[in-house]
């Protein structure tokens, strides 16, 4: 178990999930949203927001896993992120988390910023103000949710 825990920690540290985890922790702490659900909803959003800074590594993953053979790193990376979104859709994981109060967002972002910086290695450094955008995107993803599913505080609708 110790070795498995170490390997999991190493994987998390090297996989750019720092902001995903930090935001998920703040949502779980404030609203009781299930950590796994929050992570699943946040991952494609945060990867999209990282933009070009992660194209090379995500493109490599896309090619290694057979998700994309696109010559362009941008195209391959976008295919990889889209594949994550499709897996979420297939598992009926919503594209949004309802119940996040706008007045809480600055405090939540400050908590996430404090946790993620400098504890997690991330491809792009964001401050609390920039992290607020992620919370707003989590609410706005409903417009792009292909499953029609939503959640209220982490409970299936």
Language model region names:
Residues 1-86:
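Active-site segments that bind and position negatively charged phosphate/pyrophosphate groups
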Residues 58, 68-157:
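C-terminal charged capping/lid subdomain of soluble metabolic enzymes
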